[in-house]
Amino acid sequence: MPGLTISILQQPLVWMDGPANLRHFDRQLEDITGRDVIVLPEMFTTGFAMEAAKQSMPQEEVVAWMHAKAQQTNALIAGSAALQTERGPVNRFLLVEPEGKVHFYDKRHLFRMADEHHHYEAGNERVVFEWRGWRILPLVCYDQI
């Protein structure tokens, strides 16, 4: 089985400004080709903030942007965002395929030293899916298997 080529992107995030952060990532993604997976930072739309879900972009907008980038790069685009959901605010790791299929995982082990557990609902299930012949188990910073 061929290996996966993975790129991990990092940048100083504009605090609590989703559109500005997406513009920065647009520029970073312009010339990336030949990758299987591109990973964005935790809470890539807002920065790691406890109140981020209250000011976050709607999930549909984040997924639409990720889908466009997945199509542009022909890669799985992955990154977490603070989102409001029917269960309350979550730190949701989204993984979007070029064809539009969306996988998601809600962070299970919240970072207590930053009081993340007081601001976000913990996920309650492991997610495993296949991408280009590889089984992928998404995790977010501080998650433990």
Predicted region positions:
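Short catalytic-loop micro-motif centered on adjacent basic/acidic residues
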Residues: I8, A78, I136-L139
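Extreme N-terminal starter segment of soluble prokaryotic enzymes
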Residues: M1-I8
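Active-site catalytic loop in hydrolytic enzyme cores
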Residues: Q84-I145
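N-terminal phosphate-binding loop and adjacent alpha-helix
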Residues: Q10-Q28
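Hydrophobic pocket-lining residues within nucleotide cofactor-binding pockets
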Residues: Q11-V14, F44, L110, Q144
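Short loop/turn motifs at secondary-structure junctions
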Residues: T5, T33-G34, R135
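Cys-nucleophile CN-hydrolase/nitrilase-fold catalytic domain and related Cys-dependent amidase chemistry
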Residues: G18, R27-P98, H103
